[in-house]
Amino acid sequence: CTYAENFLHILGAEKITPLMTRIMDATLVLHGEHTINASTFTAMVTSSTLANASQVVASAIGSLSGPLHGGANEKVIAMLQKIESKEEIRPWLDETLKAKNVVWGMGHREYSVKDPRANILTDMVQELFEEREGGVTDIFEKAIELEKACEEKLSHKGVYPNVDFYSGILYKEMDIPTDIFTPIFAMSRVSGWLAHWIEQIQDNKIFRPTQNYVGSDDRAYICLLYTSPSPRDGQI
């Protein structure tokens, strides 16, 4: 029993096929490491203080908890579920772009082309549907249509699907609860975080960036006693 297969058993999957195991294993590998993102950088900074491995992972998870880093594949699913049909994709995209709202799962700071990890996951989604012989689902059809529409409107800006766009669909089709998506990401990224921990402590120098102050030169000190409301005044 592999690590990926055992995890699917723990989640309570009723029928685990070799393809499902391969997909889970592939997603863990694809998410294992991907340059210096926020959580990895946090892990590196914590490592530089000579904190132990558990503390390094804990700090990275803290960074991952922020909405701008983790949870994008969960938001992709919620976004696609709100769109009634694939025919509504283009009108929805026009309204979203006009309002300058986020199209979740689109664009990546490191790529001006489709995320290579997303290409692998797209093929795996199709393999999963072929194995089940039930045709593609409504949510996958909407995802394909949205990718086409975004390519027409956003490719000139280098905006294409990233790894989160299809990973959530894969997990959903394997009946994995949405609120487990980000913990799965953390589970896979632990290997990358700890690889950076090992690398850091082998030739360590504590992170200490220089900060240039650009405020006023002289400022008056104001005692907080005279600026904060007193609890006894009932003004908390």
Give the residues covered by each predicted segment.
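Conserved small/polar residues in nucleotide/adenosyl-binding loops
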Residues: 226-231, 235
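Short alpha-helical linear motifs
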Residues: 65-68, 100-103, 204-212
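Short glycine/threonine-rich loop-to-helix capping motif typified by GTGT followed
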Residues: 117, 172, 176-177, 219-222
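Short, well-ordered loop/turn and helix-capping segments at boundaries between secondary-structure elements
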Residues: 78-86, 127-131, 176, 186, ...
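Accessory "access/gating" subregions that flank catalytic or transport cores
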Residues: 1-55, 63, 78-158
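Conserved phosphate/anionic-ligand binding catalytic regions in large, soluble enzymes, centered on
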Residues: 49-77, 103-112, 160-196
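C-terminal auxiliary extensions adjacent to catalytic cores
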Residues: 201-225
